[in-house]
Amino acid sequence: MGINTVVLIRAGLGKWIASPFQCLLGKEDVYYPPVDLVEMFLTLADKYDMAFYFGMYDSGKYWQEGLFQKEIDLNMALIDEVWKKYGHHKSFQGWYLSQEISRRTKNMSKIYAEVGKHAKSVSGNLTTLVSPYIHGVKTDQVMAGDKALSVKEHEEEWDEILDNVKGAVDIMAFQDGQVDYNELYDYLVINKKLADKYNMKCWTNIESFDRDMPIRFLPIKWEKLLLKLDAARRAGMEKA
């Protein structure tokens, strides 16, 4: 099958943005980009018949500081501008809500809910995607001394989060690199169970880099990648 979906991980992070978005250039301290990468990616996705998902802007500060409405307002303005400028592309098939969380963090579901619903309303109900991560043994927080979530705790917290974002999120694609290989299947089974409960599609974000190494991030070896692919297959993931 090859590659049929391309996701822009973020429209920007902090000062760096992927295209000259006027709503960000006018309000945020960002650098002017030399190339319109969004137009380039969409044109190529059109050419090769791929589905393109546009990723939101991550301020790198507001939502971490609890200033959720600031993050929401920036992204709502971005959605309006992006859809008006790029919505004619046949490959523009959805939106990626790019703020990454692992648990009930500072009421983060508010961003998913409001931004997701706005994106869908502007674009004629295009698909929305999130890719959170599992709060497992390989997260920065746990390696710094926090406690990893058990499978049961993961299910309880994400049941609450998904209930809060009903109608705003269509696809859930958890990153798979923050738990050990022998634990992954159990978490994926819960992800699929929750996705089914809330009528969402369940993909998996298979990371092709290695979190076990002291350098961020070396390519993963095939044996590890195969273990993750097999766990995804057995758990019933719809796309990887």
Model-identified regions with their sequence ranges:
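Glycan-processing catalytic domains of CAZymes
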Residues: 1-240
